[in-house]
Design a protein with these regions (language model features):
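N-terminal first-folded block
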Residues: 1-39
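Intrinsically disordered, low-complexity sequence elements enriched in Ser/Thr/Gly/Pro
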Residues: 11, 46, 66-68
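Residue-level recognition of the GNAT/N-acetyltransferase active site
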Residues: 42
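Conserved acetyl-CoA pyrophosphate-binding loop and the N-cap/start of the following alpha-helix
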Residues: 45, 49-54
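C-terminal structural segments of small proteins and small subunits
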Residues: 57-92
Length: 92
């Protein structure tokens, strides 16, 4: 899905607006580790690949920034398992 996703560093999240609804992937950054804490997509928008796009944007940012990732969010953890090319980002 091709969405305009914004990195809102001040709010520690990646976000997009779809059909007037804010969708987010929240994270916490500490000592070079991006802990992905939560994804939120309203139920009416589920199944459209929005959460996947948000997580992909967060992981791309982590890679480009030299960050490691801790997927505390179940969705982010499952996404990383499905996209094994991202597993090298995991915190040891």
């Amino acid at each position: 899905m091709n969405l305009p996703i914004t990195h809102n560093a001040a709010a520690s999240r990646f976000e997009t607006i779809v059909d007037g609804h804010l969708c987010v992937a929240d994270y916490q950054l500490d000592d070079g580790v991006m802990t992905m804490t939560h994804t939120l997509v309203p139920p009416a928008l589920e199944g459209r690949g929005i959460a996947a796009a948000l997580v992909a944007a967060a992981l791309a940012h982590a890679r480009a920034s030299g960050l490691r990732v801790r997927p505390a969010c179940n969705y982010a953890a499952r996404s990383m398992q499905r996209h094994r090319e991202t597993l090298d980002l995991l915190v040891a």
